[in-house]
Regions:
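Non-catalytic nucleic-acid substrate-recognition regions in nucleic-acid-modifying enzymes
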Residues: 2-136
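Short beta-strand/turn micro-motifs composed of small residues
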Residues: 10, 258, 338
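Residue-level signal for inorganic ion chemistry
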Residues: 22, 95, 142, 302, ...
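A short, flexible beta-alpha/helix-coil linker loop
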Residues: 100-103, 159, 304-308
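C-terminal edge-of-domain segments
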Residues: 140-156, 367
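SAM-dependent Rossmann-like transferase core, predominantly class I methyltransferases
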Residues: 151-187
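Conserved S-adenosyl-L-methionine
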Residues: 174-291, 307-308, 314
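C-terminal catalytic and target-recognition region of SAM-dependent MTase-like enzymes
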Residues: 286-289, 293-370
């Protein structure tokens, strides 16, 4: 198979981090755009990206791109795409996509046209008047932006933020990809004492442990392309072997605390499922009263937002109490994510730096104190 172009969509604000991550994986020609990152490679690169990418949402093959101002343009562009390189005659190929700022603005109509064109192309190539679609799934995705169409083939299936360890969560889940991003922003590599005082279901601590171990986040899950006839099974076997060979061994100091014992029980279950249960200490404690576990370290947390678990005023009071509690914790570098636009006011001090991110569709800032 020739070199392919791959696209890794990501949450807004994580593009640079994802680009750096893909470069560290030795993937080639990495290019960063808004909410997505491109790279080039073969199926081995695709498998590595799926297994090892912590902050991207999925890995897709760019099949073709073209301009379309009419449904006929869209039909002909898709029909000219060599889908048979990947999709066999019995393959199922559902279509998803979106359109923004384009003449072709009806997504259901665009889906129907893309599907019709794909059926026409594959029917002609395989000499079939009807395609059974009884085989494995080859998810087609399209993007139409300012009348420019990109057609993709999704290799991941379920979004990469679903690692396979978090089957239960409390009321305020932070995406695993966002948790990994926060740990990366804190530059945690396993040497510092790491503490999440609002650990909830344990996601930030678990992602920190996996980063400390250099453990590939996708080892405990499967991917759509694993079932494709065009991708040799040895590709996945080799990628998993190489990922395991890159793991570190060591002792790490990771603490997750929370005032809610039910959340802590879920966190412990999730940590065990992730294979890092022995690396994380979970402790029931009030973040506004708990003694600092050590004189210095990294504090990374996602305190309750007013939009969800607490009323807004209660959340604001919590931020104030937490800020007063940490007033003299000068040895701690703090990375706190919040959707409260006046967080610094309630916390009691201005951040040294802040970075706008989106947790799903919720606009947040990571406030950095060091």
């Amino acid at each position: 198979m020739d070199t392919m172009t791959f696209c890794v969509p990501c949450l807004f604000g994580l593009e640079g981090l994802v680009g750096d991550e893909l470069r560290r994986l030795d993937l080639q020609n990495v290019r960063v755009e808004d909410r997505r990152v491109f790279f080039e490679g073969d199926f081995a690169a695709m498998a590595k990206a799926n297994l090892c990418c912590r902050m991207g949402e999925r890995v897709m093959i760019l099949l073709s791109e073209f301009d379309a101002h009419s449904f006929e343009d869209l039909f002909q562009g898709v029909k000219a795409t060599p889908l048979e390189r990947f999709i066999p005659k019995d393959g199922a190929f559902p279509v998803k996509g979106y359109s923004l700022n384009s003449q072709l603005h009806s997504v259901p109509d665009c889906q129907a046209i893309v599907k019709k064109a794909a059926v026409t192309r594959l029917g002609e190539k395989y000499g079939l008047g009807w395609l059974p679609e009884t085989g494995e799934t080859y998810q087609l995705r399209f993007s139409i932006m300012k009348d420019h169409v990109e057609l993709f083939l999704d290799t991941s299936g379920v979004s990469l933020h679903k690692r396979g360890y978090r089957r239960e969560a409390n009321l305020a889940p932070l995406h695993e990809t966002m948790a990994a991003a926060m740990v990366n922003l804190a530059r945690y590599r396993g040497r510092d004492f790491f503490w999440d005082p609002f650990c909830g279901s344990g996601t930030i601590c678990i992602e920190a442990a996996m980063i400390a171990l250099n453990r590939a986040p996708g080892l405990n899950r499967s991917f759509m392309a694993q079932k494709w006839s065009c991708v040799p099974e040895t590709i996945w076997q080799q990628a998993r072997t190489e990922a395991l060979d890159r793991e570190y061994r060591g002792e790490y100091h990771i603490l997750g605390s929370d005032i809610d014992p039910a959340s802590l029980e879920i966190a412990q279950q999730n940590a065990r499922k992730a294979g890092v249960g022995k690396l994380i200490e979970f402790r029931e404690a009030d973040a506004t009263k708990m003694s600092l576990p050590t004189d210095k370290g990294l504090l990374v947390c996602n305190p309750p937002y007013g939009e969800r678990m607490l009323e807004q005023r209660s959340a604001q009071r919590l931020y104030g109490a937490f800020g007063r509690h940490l007033k003299y914790a000068d040895g701690w570098k703090k990375y706190i994510i919040s959707s409260e636009p006046e967080f610094e006011h309630y916390f009691g001090r201005q951040a040294v730096k802040k970075r706008k991110l989106y947790n799903g569709r919720l606009q947040c800032n990571v406030y950095m104190y060091y």
